[in-house]
Amino acid sequence: MLRQRFVFDTTALTDSQAWESEGCTTLCEGMSAILHRVAQARLHLGISCYVPYPSVYNEIRDFVRNNNCDIAILGKIDTWLVKKTPDRYRVKIPSKIFYEYVDYMRSRINKGMNVSEEAIWEAVSRCLSISATGEGREQMREEIEREVVGSIIRKFREKYRAALRYGILDSAPDIDVLLLAKDLDAAVVSQDLGIQRWAEQLGLRFMEARAFPQMVREYMSFVPLHTEELEDRMV
């Protein structure tokens, strides 16, 4: 079997669909189960799974701590995930990709600006309709804060995220995942739409987080190992 390499982003371990496919009901159980699959892939299939260090590695460790997971999971992370810093000076990205990214970001920023303008106009219109009723100033202020400002801000946040965040690379760890995969000629494992989009632009193999455990299970079903062989491979 051709030796394969995969680069994980944080969602490769934290995506609910990935660990629910393993029959888990909590994030901590799910991360442990997926790391078990990573161990199987390493020992029996010659598959190596990497995480960019320190960016993604620290994000994953923070997830473990913030969700009060068993400290043993930290040990599994250090044991089975290969930590590597991408060579940001050696990896070359075609100028066409850079041009397309800037153009794409400009269009998303314009969408975000349109969402902002819509929210402002809606707020003004609703405030005018309330003031037209002739209520007392204090009562009007409370009603505006309660009925107008709060609801518009919630709606604005949802639309702004959709316009500006989904499908883009919005953090250094996202970029590190792509650079490391490019450096290693590895596949990317993620549930992030931005990483997926730009992995495809860079010609990188991409696998959704939920598909990785299924892939390992499928491989393992065709690798019948006797007890002696298992022990030998674990030495």
From Swiss-Prot:
GO terms for molecular function: ribonuclease P activity. NCBIfam families: PRK04358.1-4, RNA_lig_partner. This is RNA-free ribonuclease P. It catalyses: Endonucleolytic cleavage of RNA, removing 5'-extranucleotides from tRNA precursor. The keyword Signal does not apply. The keyword Nuclease applies. Belongs to the HARP family. It comes from Methanothrix thermoacetophila (strain DSM 6194 / JCM 14653 / NBRC 101360 / PT) (Methanosaeta thermophila). It holds the Pfam family PIN_5.
